[in-house]
């Protein structure tokens, strides 16, 4: 369980950081908040 949780967190953190860094999040399904404009 511990390993699975860590693996999921490690995989999710970089993805969120990448999407947050990108200014364009309109057509990006990986983006939590779709920002258009």
Curated annotation (Swiss-Prot):
Does the keyword field hold Transferase?
Answer: no
Q: Indicate yes or no for the key word Disulfide bond.
A: yes
Q: Where is this region: Disordered?
A: 1-23
Entry keywords, A to Z: Acetylcholine receptor inhibiting toxin, Amidation, Disulfide bond, G-protein coupled receptor impairing toxin, Ion channel impairing toxin, Neurotoxin, Postsynaptic neurotoxin, Secreted, Toxin
Q: Name one GO cellular component term.
A: host cell postsynaptic membrane
Basic and acidic residues: which segments have biased composition?
1-15
Tissue-specificity statement: Expressed by the venom duct.
Residues where Cysteine amide is found: 36
What intrachain disulfides are recorded? Answer: 25-31, 26-36
List localization entries. Secreted
* Residue ranges the record assigns to the propeptide: 1-22
Query: From the Swiss-Prot or TrEMBL record, what is one GO molecular function term?
Result: toxin activity
Name one matching Pfam family.
Answer: Toxin_8
Record note on domains:
The cysteine framework is I (CC-C-C). Alpha4/4 pattern.
Question: Briefly, what is this protein's role?
Answer: Alpha-conotoxins act on postsynaptic membranes, they bind to the nicotinic acetylcholine receptors (nAChR) and thus inhibit them. This toxin inhibits high voltage-activated (HVA) calcium channel currents in rat DRG neurons (13% inhibition at 1 uM toxin) probably by activating GABA(B) receptors (GABBR1 and/or GABBR2).
- Similarity section: Belongs to the conotoxin A superfamily.
Protein name per its UniProtKB record:
Alpha-conotoxin-like Kn1.2
